[in-house]
Amino acid sequence: SDMEPDMWRKLVHIIHENYDLYHGFVILHGTDTMAYTASALSFMLEGLDKPVILTGSQLPIGVLRTDGKENLMTSIEIAAAQDKEGKALVPEVCIFFENHLMRGNRTTKMNAENFNAFRSFNYPVLAEAGIHIKYNQAQIHVNKSKQELVPHYLLDTNIVVLKLFPGIQENVIATMLGT
């Protein structure tokens, strides 16, 4: 819960500065704000053609039954995976958790008590890990342009989420918008 937009900027800067040195990136992250970070990075890294995989664990990595070791090892394997032409199999920002690789900007944390904590409700999983990793290639975004990576650092944090419903009063909206 300590993650803030300044830290997203730092992550983008680190990825941009090291982009040509690595085939992919794995970010170890706390679970409470992981989906927010993944979504933000997906929009801040324009022209991405390498994997950026966020992962973490429900139990600390030193605990006997931790899910962290498997999440980390599989994230590294996915981040390094390439096709026969040497291109990344998953060139986008993702979350890997409990055997599922999900698009970063389509993932939500749903459960703080189970290992299967994240879901992608409006988009299918990009890969599923078992004995083998099965990639859902038809759903994976591929950057077909030859655009170089463009990092975006400007973020507007003056936002509000307004849920509309039948019967909402105009004065409620005006108060929330400060007008």
Q: What feature does the model see in each segment?
A:
Residues 1-17:
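ATP/NTP phosphate-donor binding region
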Residues 14, 38-43, 170-173:
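Short, charged beta->alpha transition segments
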Residues 15-18, 44, 79-82, 176:
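Hydrophobic helix-cap positions at the C-terminus of alpha-helices
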Residues 23-24:
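Structural motif
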Residues 27-50:
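Short Gly/Thr/Asp-enriched flexible loops that form oxyanion-binding sites at enzyme active sites
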Residues 50-51, 179:
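Loop/turn elements at helix/coil->beta-strand transitions in domains of secreted/extracellular proteins
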Residues 54-132:
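Internal gly/pro-rich beta-alpha loop/helix module
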Residues 103-179:
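Accessory alpha-helical/coil subdomains and C-terminal extensions
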